[in-house]
C-alpha cells in the first residue's frame, strides 16, 4: 500500500483510512488499488474481526477525482468495472462487518462506498450528496441500486436528481445512517462500536452478513434454505458450544472463530 491509504489496527479492529485530504479523498486508480490491498489484508488477518472505513481530513470522500478522472488509457466504463467494482465487491464479501465512518461529507462514488458498507456512522455536521445531475453524469458505484433498495424508487430518484445535501439527521430518519455522533468523536465512537462487535461470535457475524447480502437479491425461500444450511454449520462449531456453555456458566464467551 502507498500513502493513499493508512492501515491501522486497534485490538481486533482494522482502521482503513483514505489519505488524500488535500483532494478531499477523491478517488484515483491508485486509491482504488490501495483500498483493495487494505481490505485483502484485513480479510487474511485472523486477528481482525471488524473494520472501520473512513477518510482523513475534512471529508469521507468527494467522489472521483475529476482532475484525474479523464486521464489514462482506460475508459470510464473500464475504470468502474475493473478499479472500483473489485473494492466494492470486497466490502460486500469480506466476512467481517465494515463500518463506514463519515466525516464532512460523502459525495459521488464516495456516497456509494459509504452506503455499500455494512453499517454507517455519520458525524453530526456531515452530509451525503449525489451531485451527478449538476455535472451531466449518472450516479455510479451501484448507488442507484443501493438507494432504490434502501429508500424505494420515488424517494431515491428524487434525492438523486435534485442533487441536494442529505444531512446526517435526515439520513438517520431515512434509515440510511445507523448512528449520528458529535464530529469530534466520530473516529473514536466508530472504533468503539467496532470493538463491541468483535465480542460477538465471528462465525455468526460472517454468516448473518452473507445471508442478508443474499436476501437483497433473492426470494424468501432461497434465504430460508441458506439460513438452514448456515445454522447447521454453526450449530456444529466450537463457538456455538462455547456460547451455550458461557450462557449457563454466566460468563462472557470466548469465541475463536471455529
Regions found by a protein language model. Name each.
Residues 212-218:
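Short, charged, surface-exposed hinge/linker loops at domain edges
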Residues 19, 64, 103:
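Histidine-centered beta-alpha loop that forms part of the nucleotide-sugar donor binding/catalytic region
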Residues 1-56, 89:
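Conserved CoA-thioester-binding segment of acyl-CoA-metabolizing enzymes
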Residues 89-205, 228-229, 233-237, 241-245, ...:
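Crotonase-fold acyl-CoA enzyme core
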Residues 31-34, 80-83, 113, 186, ...:
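Hydrophobic alpha-helical membrane-association signature
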Amino acid at each position: 500500500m502507498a500513502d493513499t491509504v493508512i492501515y491501522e489496527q486497534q485490538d481486533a479492529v482494522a482502521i482503513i483510512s483514505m489519505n488524500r485530504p488535500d483532494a478531499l479523498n477523491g478517488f484515483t486508480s491508485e486509491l482504488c488499488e490501495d483500498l483493495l490491498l487494505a481490505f485483502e489484508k484485513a480479510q487474511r488477518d485472523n486477528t481482525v474481526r471488524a473494520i472501520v472505513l473512513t477518510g482523513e481530513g475534512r471529508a469521507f470522500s468527494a467522489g472521483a477525482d475529476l482532475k484525474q478522472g479523464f486521464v489514462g488509457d482506460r475508459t470510464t466504463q473500464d475504470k468502474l468495472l475493473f478499479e472500483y467494482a473489485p473494492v466494492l465487491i470486497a466490502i460486500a464479501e469480506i466476512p467481517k462487518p465494515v463500518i463506514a465512518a463519515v466525516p464532512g461529507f460523502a459525495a459521488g462514488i464516495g456516497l456509494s462506498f459509504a452506503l455499500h458498507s455494512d453499517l454507517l456512522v455519520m458525524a453530526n455536521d456531515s452530509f451525503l450528496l449525489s451531485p451527478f445531475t449538476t455535472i451531466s453524469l449518472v450516479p455510479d458505484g451501484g448507488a442507484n441500486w443501493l438507494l432504490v433498495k434502501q429508500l424505494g424508487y420515488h424517494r431515491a430518484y428524487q434525492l438523486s436528481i435534485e442533487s441536494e445535501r442529505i444531512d446526517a439527521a435526515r439520513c438517520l430518519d431515512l434509515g440510511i445512517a445507523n448512528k449520528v455522533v458529535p464530529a469530534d468523536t466520530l473516529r473514536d465512537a466508530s472504533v468503539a462500536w467496532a470493538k463491541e462487535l468483535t465480542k460477538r461470535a465471528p462465525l455468526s457475524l460472517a454468516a448473518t452478513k452473507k445471508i442478508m447480502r443474499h436476501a437483497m437479491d433473492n426470494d424468501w425461500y432461497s434465504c430460508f434454505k441458506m439460513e438452514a444450511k448456515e445454522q447447521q454449520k454453526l450449530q456444529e462449531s466450537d463457538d456455538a458450544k462455547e456460547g451455550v456453555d458461557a450462557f449457563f456458566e454466566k460468563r462472557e464467551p470466548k469465541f475463536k472463530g471455529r
